A protein has these predicted regions:
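Structured catalytic-domain cores with a bias toward divalent-metal coordination
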Residues: 1-186
Length: 186
């Protein structure tokens, strides 16, 4: 289905799985860069496979954040503004398309989640070795939990990021949300 933000101005394909037992909330996003299809496909498959009766807490999956560019096969930047969504967080409520999307995520989604996994892959033109970034510039507990999340991923490289704004997962970590960004190669 679709999930609406910003009073209905932003509509994204998503799935919310409410577990049988109460617990924390995990956000999983794909399509920050609309040409990174591996993360988008992983979100689609997760949304179809996860079962509420086997889930504790809530999982929110936003399958394609940069929906306009994805639907128009227009590359990974914002369709109307040419901006990289992963460089504009926390966003601006009166800004460009990507800045408004980042703002909606910052104000409407991040306050409701405890953990965040941002799925990426090599874009159309990239050839990447899989790796995972974890938040390294946040409160100590957030950094430690982010590192533990990253350690669960089977990739050859793990990188501690020292950035606290611009990217979705970095900004989320600066707001107290344990976060990782997974690059699955391309």
């Amino acid at each position: 289905g679709d999930i609406s933000f910003a009073n209905g101005d932003i509509v994204l394909p998503g799935t919310i799985i409410c577990g049988k037992l109460p617990g924390k909330t995990m956000l999983i996003t794909g399509g920050v860069h609309s040409g990174e299809y591996v993360g988008i496909q992983a979100c689609v498959e997760l949304g179809a496979e996860l079962q509420p009766e086997k889930t504790v807490g809530t999982i929110v999956i936003l399958k394609v954040l940069n929906r306009p560019a994805f639907e128009n096969r227009a590359g990974s930047l914002g369709l109307s503004d040419g901006k990289n969504l992963n460089r504009v967080f926390p966003g601006n409520p009166n800004g460009t398309e990507m800045e408004r999307l980042a703002w909606a995520m910052t104000k409407e989604v991040f306050p409701k989640v405890d953990y965040y996994i941002d799925l990426h892959s090599g874009d159309d033109f990239e050839d990447l070795t899989p790796y995972v970034y974890y938040a390294g510039k946040a409160a100590q507990e957030v950094m430690e939990t982010s590192r533990k999340m990253a350690e669960q991923v089977d990739v050859p490289y793990m990188v501690r990021s020292m950035v606290s704004s611009g990217g979705a997962y970095n900004y989320a970590a600066s707001r107290g949300i344990a976060s990782i960004l997974l690059e699955r190669g391309g």
